[in-house]
Amino acid sequence: CIRDRCPPQPLNDVTTVVFAGDHGIASNGVSAYPTDVSVQMASNIESGGAAVSVLAKRAGTSVRVIDVSLNSGSEADTHICDGSGSIDREDAMSRDEYRRALQVGIDAADREIDSGVDLLIAGDLGIGNTTPAAALIGALTNTEPVVVVGRGTGIDDNGWKRKTAAIRDAMYRVHNIHDEPASVLQFISSPDITAMVGFLAQAAVRRTPVILDGIVMCAAALVAEKLAPGAKQWWVAGHRSVEPAQKIALRELELTPVVDLGMRLGEGSGAVVTLMIVNAAVDIIRNMATFDEAGVSTAADAEDSGAEDSPAEAPGAEE
């Protein structure tokens, strides 16, 4: 039950936090869309026109976008840098950027939890972000690059080959430090994914449940669990993505997704769909009457009735 309460309390205050960032690796042609889509979609979410915005309205959750590393030139405190390094040949970020990004996520979790939320949803936004996510999962689970590569935004075969090469090269750069998750995170992820790690770990520290979204958030969860063992006890796997690396991460985390609808959008959209099911489950546990409370006959009643209807044995029938 949610937050160790049974029956669980209604989820009256839920916030979806979308961590946004651009990725240097996108210049390698690993996505079907141009990089300026990231900033445009962040604006679309905030104006209520994105899929997660529409779903959130139906599910009863607010949505907040945090620009961690979009190519936006933002001067906000949460903005670490414009984009990240191309992870196939350079570090995703400096050590200072890594620390600051981690703190952005920690602060975001604290802010929402201090405001009284019952549950959090974590989402992602950024063209090319499934590439560092797959590289992280591959590196931390010692899985071959070709096994973790998915189609992302719907790339063709040539795009898939470019993406495979990028992930292979990124994983090679950290092949000797698989047991150093913080360094792997700094070298082949991104500031926005690093912020997600801080967010997930801090939510667990604060004993606040989080519904995870797709491959990017599951990659962050994999790192967060390694940095803060036991954190996964506070997470729910929202849905199974079509990305193969997500399945590997969920298996490593021992989490079972609530739904499998073939979703691949990101933004936290799959997790918001799951929220509707979680809310339904809470209502069932809180409000559905038992057979006894409703005065409905049970199987035991049928057995008792059958015993009463059986004819009595005649005395002396057996000698």
Give residue ranges: language-model regions.
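A glycine- and small-aliphatic-rich helix-loop capping segment at beta-alpha/alpha-beta transitions
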Residues: 33-39, 135-147, 227-233, 280-281
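Conserved small/polar residues in nucleotide/adenosyl-binding loops
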Residues: 1-4
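Short glycine/serine/threonine-rich phosphate/pyrophosphate-binding segments
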Residues: 26-28, 122, 127-134, 193-197, ...
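Glycine-rich, mobile lid/loop segments that gate access to catalytic sites or pores
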Residues: 81-130, 135-141, 152-156
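Phosphate/pyrophosphate-binding betaalpha-module
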Residues: 120, 131-195
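Active-site cofactor/substrate anionic-group-binding motifs, chiefly glycine-
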Residues: 10-73
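Internal helix-turn-beta structural module
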Residues: 243-292
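Hydrophobic alpha-helical bundle architecture
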Residues: 198-237, 256-263
